């Protein structure tokens, strides 16, 4: 654990009878008192949740956010809003932590087996994600990457959408890559936003961006705000993070 049981400060709080909760339990409480927008998945969740948080934070809606990486836009993994009903959360599957959550909406990016020291088998790992989908609140939505080996088990009243780079209810079209830039058109069931520039022009961010934009679109972030937010997104520290980028040398931290 990050803090051993014999740590002096932890021992003090135990001795004085304070209630002590894990981070995941606290986040669960927060999702039951706000509209939790949670991003789960083996990989892609940190970038996607940070991107979604930026889309909301720079819009007229705003958000609170608890992220798994340091946003390069804000220099922190915590965003606070006094007025927004939305909380963007990176939903961590380690130790089944995401089972404490009660999402209003959730993205699932990937279900490649991981943390097998906890889960033991691929089947147990997938079952954990299936159970997670049962926690989404009626009236909310699941946005799941198209083609995953996961059968969602959502409650009645939960909408299910698919997404990916090239197909699904939400996807990208007219992808243009050149001169160090990426432009896409974002396609949703009820709209299309043309000529979106990715602030971090990396191929995988097309798919991550589609998921983040889907979450934003379904919750009232305007087309123009989405377009501006994607262009101004600067990425996440140590997630395909360019430290040196010259004509002779590229050095990445990831």
Residue ranges and their predicted role:
Residues 1-2, 176:
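Beta-strand C-termini and the immediately following turn/loop, strongest in propeller blades
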Residues 2-146, 150-159, 210, 216-217:
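Phosphate-binding loop of NTP-binding sites
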Residues 119-126, 156-253:
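Adenine nucleotide phosphate-binding catalytic loops in nucleotide-utilizing enzymes
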């Amino acid at each position: 654990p990050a803090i051993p049981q014999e740590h002096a400060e932890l021992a003090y709080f135990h001795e004085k009878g304070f209630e002590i909760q894990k981070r995941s339990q606290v986040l669960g409480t927060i999702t039951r008192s706000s509209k939790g927008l949670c991003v789960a998945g083996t990989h892609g969740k940190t970038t996607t949740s940070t991107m979604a948080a930026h889309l909301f934070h720079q819009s007229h809606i705003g958000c609170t956010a608890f992220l798994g990486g340091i946003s390069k836009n804000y220099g922190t993994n915590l965003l606070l809003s006094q007025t927004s009903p939305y909380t963007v959360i990176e939903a961590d599957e380690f130790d089944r932590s995401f089972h404490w959550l009660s999402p209003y909406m959730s993205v699932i990016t990937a279900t490649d087996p991981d943390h097998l020291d906890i889960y033991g088998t691929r089947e147990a790992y997938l079952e954990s994600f299936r159970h997670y989908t049962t926690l989404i609140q009626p009236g909310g939505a699941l946005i799941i990457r198209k083609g995953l080996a996961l059968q969602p088990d959502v409650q009645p009243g939960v909408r299910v959408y698919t997404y990916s780079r090239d197909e699904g209810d939400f996807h990208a079209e007219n992808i243009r890559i050149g001169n160090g830039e990426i432009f896409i058109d974002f396609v949703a069931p009820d709209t299309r936003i043309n000529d979106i520039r990715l602030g971090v022009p990396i191929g995988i961010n097309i798919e991550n961006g589609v998921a983040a934009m889907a979450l934003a679109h379904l919750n009232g972030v305007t087309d123009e705000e989405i377009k501006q937010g994607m262009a101004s997104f600067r990425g996440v520290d140590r997630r395909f993070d360019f430290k040196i980028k010259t004509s002779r040398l590229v050095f990445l931290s990831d």
